């Protein structure tokens, strides 16, 4: 978001993301489609992550020009990056498909989740080298990852992607 002229910190976003319990009293788990599951910081309790819907909703609190690409093929995501728009995506910590999914009962029904869920911002790519560059919240800027593996993980994780275009002259946020 900072890239697009939106003055907001990661901490502020973390404080404002919708959250749901990791586990309810009845044994059901939170649904990442409804909010960040558990503790965002991980300091007070377990946390899993969040899917595109709550991220889109959060971004709309700060900018008018937010777009949800969820369901789009990976080429569409790459095209947006080529147009100059970094794209937030859901992937895995391996940046490749994983096999450690488990089924959770949630208030909305059963969903399959993985503790390998991860999100990054795609910042660039090199078609000749077949690599994608991502800003990884684990401390890596423009981290190089394999294109085909990343595209397969993107598909496995539900083709979830959100991007923001240059900030309009919006004067109030949140």
Regions flagged by a language model, labelled:
Residues 70-73, 91-95, 124-126, 136-138:
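A mature extracytoplasmic/lumenal domain signature
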Residues 41-45, 97-108:
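Short, flexible/disordered intra-domain loops and linkers
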Residues 81, 85-87, 92-93, 103:
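Short coil-to-beta transition motif at edge beta-strands of beta-rich domains
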């Amino acid at each position: 978001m900072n890239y697009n002229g939106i003055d907001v910190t990661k901490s502020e976003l973390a404080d404002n993301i919708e959250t749901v319990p990791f586990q309810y009293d009845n044994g059901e788990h939170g649904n990442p489609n409804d909010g960040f599951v558990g503790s965002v910081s991980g300091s007070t309790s377990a946390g899993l992550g969040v899917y595109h819907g709550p991220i889109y909703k959060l971004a709309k609190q700060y900018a008018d020009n937010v777009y949800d690409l969820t369901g789009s093929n990976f080429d569409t995501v790459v095209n947006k990056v080529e147009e100059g728009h970094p794209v937030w995506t859901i992937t895995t910590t391996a940046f490749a498909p994983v096999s450690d999914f488990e089924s959770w009962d949630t208030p909305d029904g059963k969903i399959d989740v993985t503790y390998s869920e991860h999100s990054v911002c795609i910042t660039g790519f090199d078609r000749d080298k077949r690599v994608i560059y991502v800003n990884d919240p684990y401390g890596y800027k423009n981290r190089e990852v394999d294109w085909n593996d990343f595209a397969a993980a993107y598909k496995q994780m539900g083709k979830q992607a959100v991007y923001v275009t240059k900030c309009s002259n919006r004067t109030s946020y949140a």
